[in-house]
């Protein structure tokens, strides 16, 4: 596996692979890799001939007071994991390489509607930052396909819309969330949890599962269901940012008639913000 730090080196390496007739797969990350990230790399190796990963902690998607400065940087360990997983090329640029003219005047990419509400409400500008950096990375790599985790469900919806609306010839694949044995979704931010908080954290997924089970059993009073489960989160010591049932494709608030649903949650446990979701299609046999 080669590691490159400049756009010029990246494009040269990808061009060589293309000249050999290889299909290109891309997995963008912010580093501090865990088993969830590695599952994306593994999936890519099964689908394409040449796998590119990126590690870039993107300042444009962090708001004031968020954890940009303390976000873990673990490049050497990440390189070892990527190599073992079969990654062919790692792009690990600096902020200056990604934004050579600074960020203040940087052209921004915005995906309206899908970026609003949920994480977009509590993290203003976040999805604009995501859409902008992903657009830049897609233009740099020009992959045949790109793979993202479904844990960031709203982000995945934004990226699908971005690719569709801007006519990018890239197949977007969403991979199921990888979980610990107790159900907690794997996340780079889980490392911020204390031992006591980590013991409490699985209640997030249990809450989603409980809501899904109630819906499967015929419950359609979504506001009452959400209110009861929100209280359960609070009783466990979490501070819910949101807990909502949405239509899985449009992300609009779900109605009792909808069949393709996603239950989404964001909640603070101590100072750590945890997000998770559970996709529930009532027309798909269990």
From Swiss-Prot:
GO terms for cellular component: cytosol. The keyword Ligase applies. Gene3D superfamilies: HUPs (3.40.50.620), Pantoate-beta-alanine ligase, C-terminal domain (3.30.1300.10). GO terms for molecular function: ATP binding; pantoate-beta-alanine ligase activity. The keyword Ligase applies. It is found in: Cytoplasm. Keywords: ATP-binding, Cytoplasm, Ligase, Nucleotide-binding, Pantothenate biosynthesis. (R)-pantoate binds at residues 61, 155. Beta-alanine binds at residue 61. It catalyses: (R)-pantoate + beta-alanine + ATP = (R)-pantothenate + AMP + diphosphate + H(+). ATP binds at residues 30-37, 149-152, 178, 186-189. Its EC number is 6.3.2.1. It is an enzyme of class 6 (ligase). Belongs to the pantothenate synthetase family. Homodimer. The reaction proceeds by a bi uni uni bi ping pong mechanism. This is Pantothenate synthetase. It comes from Pseudomonas fluorescens (strain Pf0-1). The gene is panC.
């Amino acid at each position: 596996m080669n590691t490159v730090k400049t756009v010029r080196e990246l494009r040269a390496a990808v061009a060589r692979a293309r000249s050999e007739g290889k299909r290109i797969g891309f997995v963008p990350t912010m580093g501090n890799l865990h088993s969830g990230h590695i599952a994306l790399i593994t999936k890519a190796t099964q689908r394409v001939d040449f796998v590119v990963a990126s590690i870039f902690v993107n300042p444009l998607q962090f708001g004031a007071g968020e954890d940009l400065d303390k976000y873990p940087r673990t490049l050497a360990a990440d390189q070892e994991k990527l190599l073992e997983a079969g990654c062919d090329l790692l792009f690990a640029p600096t902020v200056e390489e990604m934004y050579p003219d600074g960020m203040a005047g940087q052209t921004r990419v915005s995906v309206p509607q899908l970026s609003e509400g949920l994480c977009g409400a509590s993290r203003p500008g976040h999805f604009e930052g995501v859409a902008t950096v992903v657009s830049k990375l897609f233009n740099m790599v020009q992959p045949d396909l790109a793979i993202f985790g479904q844990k960031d469900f709203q982000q995945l919806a934004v990226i699908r819309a971005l690719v569709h609306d801007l006519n990018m010839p890239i197949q977007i694949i969403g991979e199921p969330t990888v979980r610990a044995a107790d159900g907690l979704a794997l996340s780079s931010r889980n490392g911020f949890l204390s031992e006591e908080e980590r013991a409490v954290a699985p209640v997030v997924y249990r809450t989603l599962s409980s809501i899904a089970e109630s819906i499967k059993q015929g419950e359609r009073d979504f506001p009452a269901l959400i209110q009861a489960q929100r209280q359960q989160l609070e009783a466990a010591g979490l501070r819910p940012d949101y807990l909502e049932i949405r239509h899985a494709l449009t992300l609009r608030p779900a109605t009792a008639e909808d069949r393709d649903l996603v239950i989404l949650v964001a909640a603070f446990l101590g100072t750590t913000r945890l997000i998770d979701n559970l996709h529930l299609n009532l027309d798909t046999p269990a």
